[in-house]
Amino acid sequence: MSYNLTDPYEIARFIKESKKSTPVKVYVNGDLSEALMDDIEWYGANGFYILIGESDLVAKIILDNKHLIKHFRLENDRRNSAIPMLDLLEVEARIEPGAIIRDKVTIGKNAVVMMGAVINIGAEIGDGTMVDMNAVIGARGKLGKNVHLGAGAVVAGVLEPPSKEPCTVGDNVLIGANSVILEGVKIGAGSVVAAGSVVAEDVPEGVVVAGSPAKIIKSVDDKTKGKTQLLDDLRK
């Protein structure tokens, strides 16, 4: 079944209709050589096993064989999760440990996603764009090429409450740390958002905005460009 992930109602339907998952990993000290484990993924022999699968299936194996188990340890990081994490193996970008990126996200070539960043379903990250530490890109947020989204900054999602217009950030935009781009706002190419700003209205191309709510304070000039220069070496 296909879904139009540019429509918040379609994303909601996708989440509703997705099979919810509570995967677990269990380390077992015990004899499971005769256990029935066809419905899960497992590894091991000679008294030590690792079981990976849905919690109810793994729990049944543990309970059915509890008389043969000396010890076990269970690891679990989600409950009734509707959307898996993005498969990073095919992404031509640098993704650092601790980034949380849901499935159905598009990440461009040579982009960088730093530790603690969160990127929600339907988001699009352009080539060479950096999403810095602890930044958040909500559902359907769109960042162009060579954007820098500063540490702790937020590009609001448009899933709940539903909105047809996502946040859109043009090419070569720099968004300072801890700024917030509110729902549906568009940032024009080459503009700069000062750190800590709250942007509630569209921003034209080539300007600097600051404050809460953010206002235009100047046009981007050579001095601004010098202070907001991106480093290509970080994207290789």
From Swiss-Prot:
Source organism phylogeny: Bacteria, Bacillati, Bacillota, Clostridia, Eubacteriales
Protein name (record): 2,3,4,5-tetrahydropyridine-2,6-dicarboxylate N-acetyltransferase
A GO BP entry: lysine biosynthetic process via diaminopimelate
Pathway annotation from the record: Amino-acid biosynthesis; L-lysine biosynthesis via DAP pathway; LL-2,6-diaminopimelate from (S)-tetrahydrodipicolinate (acetylase route): step 1/3
Protein purpose: Catalyzes the transfer of an acetyl group from acetyl-CoA to tetrahydrodipicolinate.
Species this chain originates from: Clostridium botulinum (strain Alaska E43 / Type E3)
Keywords from the named record: Acyltransferase, Amino-acid biosynthesis, Diaminopimelate biosynthesis, Lysine biosynthesis, Repeat, Transferase
Reactions catalysed: (S)-2,3,4,5-tetrahydrodipicolinate + acetyl-CoA + H2O = L-2-acetamido-6-oxoheptanedioate + CoA
GO molecular function, one term: tetrahydrodipicolinate N-acetyltransferase activity
Alphabetized PANTHER family for the sequence: 2,3,4,5-TETRAHYDROPYRIDINE-2,6-DICARBOXYLATE N-ACETYLTRANSFERASE, ACETYLTRANSFERASE
Domain of life of the source: Bacteria
Pfam families in the record: DapH_N, Hexapep
Family to which the UniProt record says this protein belongs: Belongs to the transferase hexapeptide repeat family. DapH subfamily.
Enzyme class: transferase
EC code: 2.3.1.89
